[in-house]
Amino acid sequence: MPERALAEQGQLLPDDVFASLEMTRVGLKGPTTTPIGGGHQSINVVLRKKLGLYVNFRPVITLPGLKTRFDDLALDIAIFRENTEDLYAGLEHEVVPGVVESLKIITENASLRIARAAFQFARRESRKKVTAIHKANIMKLSDGLFLKCCRQTAAQFPEIAYNELIVDNACMQLVMRPQIFDVLVLPNLYGDIVSDLAAGLVGGLGIVPGANMGDHHAIFEAVHGTAPDIAGKGLANPTALMQSAALMLAHIGERDAAKRLKSAVASVYAEGKHLTGDVGGRAGTAEFTDAVVRHIGG
């Protein structure tokens, strides 16, 4: 745990962790806690900055057999969130007592990188449309620059449709007509909020995988937070971590293994007999996992 490493070694992430990541260039990460209103920095932010993980990728896909508000729509939305700047740059200070200022950083380089990643994915996966989400009607310079970069990139992919939505309208459309979305590209803060909203459409954060990727490294993770109240009780839903492992396998070229793991998870949900409590079942972590393993072996 990062808290233990900080207490024992004075580092959130010990040097040997980074040495391993530098060697393998790939990692599978579990949830970690970030203190609210003080304490140590987010582990995710540290990793993203140190390893140049500028893409946060989250596929939001309906699982057969899982009851949700939109389980009849077979949603498949790919979300690309810029991972290194915006308000998450952490540049804030107290101007005078009672007045705090936070700086929103948007750069051409980072905006072009995330836009290119979204469009390259759309082309590679035969997707039809990329939607840029923004608040350029208010933040005309910062979000305006982000849109300029998205438009510039869209022009290089003429076979892919491109449109733009203001973030508040995009949130409304997601809960009313989620089926209209295909690939989304967003600055950091909006991406954090919208990707959690989208996860709720298909069953919540216990279901959805995530990846943080750069030019040389990639870390895959369950995007939900920690749950200290159920730690050690065998109640946690491992779906998001399994789905993230499948993303990792595909990333390193083990596409057949990735497909088998995803298919096994989907089969367990389709059967509905071994689901954890957060999705309406009565199984524990081990029972769910055993069911997935049986389907992989079968």
Model-flagged regions — what are they?
Residues 5-6, 15, 57, 173-276:
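Glycine-rich phosphate/nucleotide-binding loop
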Residues 63-91, 106-110, 225-259:
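Short, glycine-/small-residue-rich phosphate/pyrophosphate-handling segment
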Residues 96-168, 180-182:
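Glycine-rich phosphate/diphosphate-binding loop of Rossmann-like nucleotide-binding domains
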